[in-house]
Amino acid sequence: MAAPATEHVRNIVLVGQDGAGKTSLAEAMLHVSGKTPRMGTTHDGKSYLDYDEEEIRRHFTLGTSIAPIPYKDYKINLLDTSGQADFLGDTLATMQAAEMAMFVVDAVDGPQVMTTRLWHEAEAMRLCRCVFINHIDREHANFDVAMATLHARFGSRLGAVTIPMGVDKDFKGVIDVLRMKARYFEGEDERVEEIPEDYLDVAQVARDKLCDLVAEADEDLMMKYLDGEEQLTQKELEQLLDKAIAQEIFIPVFVGSTIIKQGIKGLMEDIASYFPHPRAHGPFYLANGNELYVDETGEPAGFVFKTLSDPYVGRMSFIKVLSGYLEPGMELANARSKKKERLSHLYVMMGKEPMDVKSAKAGDIIVVPKMNDTKTGDTLSLSGDIEVDPLPSPIPLYPIALEAENKKDEDKLGTFLSKQAEIDPTLRLIRYEETHQQVVFTMGDMHVDVLLNKLKNQAKIEAHLVPVRIPYRETIQKTAEAEGRHKKQTGGSGQFGDCWLRLSPNPGEGYVFASEVVGGRIPKNLIPAVDKGVQEAMAEGYLAGYPMVDINCVVFDGSYHAVDSNEMAFKTAARLAFRAACQQADPIILEPMADMDITVGEAYAGAVMGDISTRRGRIVGTDSNDEGETIIVVRVPYAEVLSYTKDLRALSRGSGAYSVRLNGYEPAPYDVQKKLVEQYEASRK
């Protein structure tokens, strides 16, 4: 495939709820264009795009696949994305590489939760949008209801470019409202005829609506049109359509059935003729505040919107060419790492199959292998000075901890997780020193399940989930004094240390050590040993093995032996004194607290607030946003919201979102402390 000119490239990202038929639409377009000898399907595991073992097993898309389709003189890059919330990060990153987001909506189910969320994301990106109403031949399909729902949800700018002739089992073709023709797809061929008489009225109504919306792209023409002075001619309508779409004045709606390939060829014609090309779209925003428009004549540069690891090829970087052109052998600089990367090969991906290309011009999408210092969100350019400001990835909030079945695989497990985190921005690794545990933050149960299967099938590591340890802490509530005396005689030189400690609470100020020893009761050179012994005892905890914090410690008296006193003896004495004082100082366990902002539809707010109360949380306040959603601000023990990602989805039917940040510690309730102490004591037996 020769490198197409920028004006002849169309980058379309397919988005929407899982099951609406995004992959089927891409497969239908591939087949209708002649790119594939048969139409791939997900249900039998023979999709060209859903080729991953996990995708075949689950029958839906887990990550972005690319389908490059040659159509006439154009190249249509279809970016097929996941409709699962757990893989939202990959979908959002891919949307940055497109000029048009095509929302695939089921004719029966209508727009679902993920459709709505991605619609608002596309709107925020200033990404052009269109809709394909799929499965119009499905039982109980209703085009009018689907359109009404779309208008109610997304506004009045949506207008039908094609409408169905019949629905459900009576569906036989589509009416092309733009050209006022009827289209029938029979076998491998399409037949275009005049509109049947019984559909002329409904076609004219749709045509008038189309003209009303598109006319707004030209102010002078719109005034004449609205005043009734003249109607839009076919030529005027076609000339204004691409402008109206690019300026988001008009959002086209198409209809069809991917399974029987109805409505597909006309859709492809309109994509080529009227959808925005990369240069006509808005700019990329750079980290330095400047803007960069896609331009064939500019400095060679590309933006990495996806990274994956292939077991045979290695790391593969999916790149949107921003300016100039790229070709094998080029050496580009990474704006983030400042390292040079050589473009060994340029591929165009067809599902999992790489196809070598000699060059790629601005606006096109390619894949480059083996750029090991480059990751998702990076920008590469000849100078290294161009850096796109990427959209932030969704923050993973669902924590898990993993252990290898075989202890010998622990290092391999850590290495694999680190590499996965490099290519997947929604996978975050944090090691908590308080618990000596590495926690993997994910997007949800499905994300975890896929990760475990990759461990098993790709890395050949068997691993299992273990409970995430909460970073509890311990402290004291009263002032107390105690002596620690260590004396040991073993026949030679012995050990002797004796010190008195005063412990007092020091809320929020951490650990402070001081000496009030006078008269040489403890030599000055052994005072640091007392400090070390106290810190070692604090690290071990007193009640349940959690580190102790916020304690003011004063050593004020003691005694020593000229021969037997040494650093080890006074460290031991300090530990004994510290534990004896803690016993009198009313020790408690502190639990980490989380501040959360929970955003849900008003209908779910009551259930969410009730649920937070059962988690020992406090409602701090409520607010609302521009979408009419309720924002609930809460403070809750972190231990109670480890699984909140999936819990909120259940409470809000998948529509809720939240942020969480650890913010301080508070005394744990008695029953929580009792349970933690019992667990600790049982583990020591």
Which residues make up each language-model segment?
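Structural and coupling elements of P-loop NTPases
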Residues: 1-685
